[in-house]
């Protein structure tokens, strides 16, 4: 298979740094424009390209790195010696092309598909700078092909030619593209590895696949970074809307499946599509890419058009838009009101006197049947009448309008009888009646059913009988029982009212205590007033002498400091009380 890859290397292009989107990478990976300019220019072939920053797995080299307004742009080449290693792990019938649709893929294109989706990002490795250090020409270490780099906007675009890789970036100006084309043409003799170690490549790829299994939002990240890099029409990267390849689903080889395989195109629906269970067994899809894209959008063919665009009767709409259109259509149907019939229909209704057979006795859904007079201007009392419209073989059963219905009556209501005795019969549009929509009637009926069920349930609970255990609705649970077996019931907090109720003290005892306290307070105030004229210094001396005498008589232990402190506290309180009494007396 490697002999069919008729080129020596593949071009790869992409941004290594997007200056305006470096917040998520962290300060350690932040690279300013001044630092990039200090490390430029780079000589072709001096910076290697490897896989997942593995120095032992070099697969290409960098041709040039340019400082552009959006960020640091890289152009390099990758050896096609990777092609036989990649394609050896793909079954022969997995990659296919529909010749009838004009999709013929070469081995180079198949390799580009695999490379674009297995290693879709670029990652720059640079030397760690000291504080206030200016980068030199050895600042850039290598460029890695990886799953997702730390820096945002670093999407790798591969191509068999330089124009195919560079042309995917819409923000590049014409002079910049011409400069890159010139470098690619001049440096196309850059040395790339002609032979690669299969065990080393296999080890690195296995390591990458294991790490990539934990990237749940890989497709979303790729699409976001693709927009940051101004890549809107990639050719091979399948985390997008335009693809040119499908991976065939394994099924039994039967003539029916073979026909389906030839007729069904490469489009696929998202994983949440409501029509997923109705897909044919032989439908081609991209299961390996569905988990990566997670985009919920339909895939298209190589030229960007629909697979069945030649029929000009198919329009591809995103699933979210299709669901919103269905919801809006349902709301419009529910909000419609009956319209008045035309005069021709009223005339045909009045002139028709035939009787419908029981099998054709239909009635619009959602409307209540009248008990006596069922239709407008029937030929007689309690007569089942249907207008001539219902005898039309093309009639599909939808009631065109709601006729005027008079209340129940015992008089015949034939139009001739009514006009000869009471004048002209009123037309169908004379008395417009506002009928509720089907949606409103459904909601009202559901509410009525719910209320009836609740009332029935309450009635059943009120009629509960201990003698009939089958009517027992629920087990009686005490407040002290645990909810789960083995669960400890927490002790309930007892309120003040419950404490008073438990003590059962008479109310009079509390009032007596309050009165006793008031009398005691009055006595203390009177004593303080009489003692306010005494000398505070002599009083203090007496207290100190008494305390010294008491302390001398007692033994020295740990309680003596406490007693001295209590005496000082009492003296302080007396002084405050005396001052308060003096203030009240003044």
From Swiss-Prot:
Assigned protein family: Belongs to the herpesviridae capsid scaffolding protein family.
SUPFAM superfamilies linked to this entry: Herpes virus serine proteinase, assemblin
Biased composition (Basic and acidic residues): 251-263
Pfam families per UniProt: Peptidase_S21
Gene3D superfamilies per record: Herpesvirus/Caudovirus protease domain (3.20.16.10)
GO biological process annotation, one example: proteolysis
Region of interest (Disordered), ranges: 251-288, 330-364, 458-486, 530-586
Residues carrying the site annotation Cleavage: 239-240, 558-559
Name of the protein: Capsid scaffolding protein
Any one of the GO CC terms: host cell cytoplasm
Gene Ontology molecular-function annotations: identical protein binding; serine-type endopeptidase activity
Compositionally biased residues, Polar residues: 264-284
Renumbered residue ranges of the record's region Interaction with pAP: 312-331
Description of its domains: Region of interaction between pPR and pAP is called Amino conserved domain (ACD). The region of interaction with major capsid protein is called carboxyl conserved domain (CCD).
EC number(s) recorded for this UniProt protein: 3.4.21.97
């Amino acid at each position: 298979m490697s002999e069919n890859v008729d080129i020596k290397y593949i071009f790869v292009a992409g941004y290594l740094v997007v200056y305006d989107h470096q917040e998520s990478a962290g300060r350690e990976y932040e690279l300013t424009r001044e630092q990039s300019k200090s490390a430029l220019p780079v000589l072709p072939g001096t910076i290697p390209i490897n896989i997942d920053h593995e120095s032992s797995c070099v697969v290409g080299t960098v041709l040039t790195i340019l400082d552009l307004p959006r960020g640091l742009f890289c152009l390099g080449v990758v050896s096609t010696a990777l092609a036989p290693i990649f394609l050896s792990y793909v079954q022969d019938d997995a990659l296919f092309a529909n010749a009838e649709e004009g999709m013929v893929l070469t081995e180079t294109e198949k390799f580009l598909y695999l490379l674009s989706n297995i290693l879709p990002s670029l990652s720059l490795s640079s030397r760690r700078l000291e504080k206030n250090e200016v980068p030199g020409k050895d600042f850039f270490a290598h460029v890695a092909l990886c799953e997702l780099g730390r820096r945002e906007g670093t999407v790798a675009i591969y191509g068999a030619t330089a124009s195919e890789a560079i042309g995917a970036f819409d923000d590049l100006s014409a002079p910049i593209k011409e400069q890159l084309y010139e470098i690619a043409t001049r440096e196309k003799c850059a040395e790339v590895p002609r032979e690669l170690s299969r065990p080393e490549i296999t080890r690195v790829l296995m390591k990458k696949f294991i790490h990539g299994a934990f990237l749940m939002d890989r497709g979303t990240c790729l699409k976001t970074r693709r927009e940051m890099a101004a890549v809107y029409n990639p050719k091979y990267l399948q985390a997008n809307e335009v693809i040119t390849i499908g991976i065939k689903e394994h099924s039994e080889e039967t003539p029916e499946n073979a026909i389906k395989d030839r007729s069904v195109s490469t489009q696929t629906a998202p994983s949440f599509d409501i029509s997923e269970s109705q897909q044919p067994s032989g439908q081609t899809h991209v299961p390996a890419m569905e988990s990566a894209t997670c985009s919920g959008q339909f895939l298209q063919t190589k030229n960007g058009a629909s697979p069945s665009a030649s029929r000009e009767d198919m329009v591809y709409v995103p699933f979210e838009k299709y669901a919103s259109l269905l919801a809006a259509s349902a709301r419009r149907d529910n909000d419609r009101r009956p319209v008045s019939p035309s005069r021709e229909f009223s005339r045909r209704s009045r002139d028709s006197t035939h009787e419908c057979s029981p099998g054709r006795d239909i009635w619009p859904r959602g409307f209540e049947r009248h008990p006596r007079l069922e239709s407008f201007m029937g030929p007689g009392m309690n007569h089942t009448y249907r207008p001539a419209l219902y005898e039309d073989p093309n009639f599909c059963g939808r009631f065109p309008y709601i006729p005027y219905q008079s209340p129940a009556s015992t008089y015949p209501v034939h139009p001739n009888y009514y006009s000869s005795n009471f004048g002209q019969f009123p037309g169908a549009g004379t008395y417009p009646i506002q009928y509720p929509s089907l949606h409103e009637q459904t909601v009202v009926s559901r509410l009525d059913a719910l209320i009836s069920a609740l009332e029935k349930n309450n009635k059943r609970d009120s009629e509960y009988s201990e003698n009939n255990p089958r009517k027992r609705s629920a087990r009686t649970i005490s407040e002290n029982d645990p909810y789960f077996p083995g669960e400890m019931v927490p002790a309930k907090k007892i309120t003040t009212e419950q404490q008073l109720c438990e003590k059962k003290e008479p109310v009079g005892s509390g009032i007596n205590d309050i009165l006793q306290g008031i009398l005691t307070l009055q006595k203390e105030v009177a004593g303080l007033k009489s003692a306010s004229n005494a000398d505070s210094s002599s009083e203090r001396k007496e207290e100190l002498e008494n305390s010294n005498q008491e302390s001398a008589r007692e033994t020295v232990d740990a309680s003596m400091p406490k007693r001295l402190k209590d005496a000082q506290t009492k003296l302080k309180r007396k002084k405050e009380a005396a001052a308060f009494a003096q203030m009240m007396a003044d």
